[in-house]
Regions:
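Conserved AdoMet
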Residues: 1-41
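Conserved class I S-adenosyl-L-methionine
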Residues: 33-51, 71-73
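Extended basic-aromatic, gly/pro-enriched interface segments that bind polyanionic ligands
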Residues: 41, 62-147, 151-161, 185-186
Length: 206
């Protein structure tokens, strides 16, 4: 049983840019997509899931004038961490991790020393308890995007490869799995191609 709670908003901007600026425009251009279904794996207290929601919301607003829907399932093994994510309330100091334009659009004061994510964005993220070691029983199928950063690093390489294979198998054709840079080196899952540059690690389903 592995629990990891250290997380931040906008932790790895190059990965977010890969999703919003490179993958998503090309994926939408296929003409077969009217909604993006994403999985934030090992979401801890929700910062990464809400960061991904901000990135998708801004990008879809720009690319589709907000006509394309998106939803994120955020999972973690820790019930206390998930409770924080569901509350969507964070210490005021954490707002400094969020770009100013996103603060204005997606954050609102809660109490003197805290802020919360606005309801419109919070409703796009559902928090569910799930143990990644039970990946064979994952309730999610045919996903557009799997975002799994700084989770696989805690496993031995053989287990990392097996988990990456399982995550990639859940993608629709053209879907993307995003890992933290360096989490799985020298390996590409079957039926995928590497996408992005040296600062990112992502694989697109063919």
């Amino acid at each position: 049983r592995l629990t990891v709670h250290q997380t931040h908003f906008f932790r790895h901007v190059p990965s977010l840019d890969l999703v919003a600026e490179q993958w998503l425009p090309a994926y939408l251009a296929r003409g077969e997509v009217d909604a993006i279904h994403a999985w934030s794996v090992g979401c801890s207290t929700g910062e990464e899931a809400f960061t991904l929601a901000m990135a998708l919301d801004r990008a879809l607003d720009r690319l589709t004038a907000g006509k394309a829907y998106f939803g994120i399932t955020a999972t973690d093994i820790s019930a206390p961490a998930l409770a924080v994510g569901r509350a969507a309330c964070y210490p005021r100091a954490k707002a400094d991790e969020i770009p100013v334009d996103c603060q204005a659009r997606y954050c609102e004061p809660d109490e003197e020393d805290s802020f919360r994510i606005v309801d419109a964005l919070r409703r796009r993220v559902g928090f569910v308890q799930f143990n990644l070691m039970d990946i064979a029983r994952a309730p999610l199928k045919r996903l557009d995007l799997v975002y799994c950063q700084n989770v696989l690093i805690y496993f031995a390489r053989e287990r990392r490869v097996a988990l990456l294979d399982a995550l990639a198998a859940l993608l629709k054709p053209g879907g993307l799995v995003v890992l933290g840079p360096g989490e799985v080196l020298g390996y590409t899952p079957a039926s995928t191609v590497r996408l992005g540059g040296p600062q990112t690690l992502a694989f697109q389903r063919t």
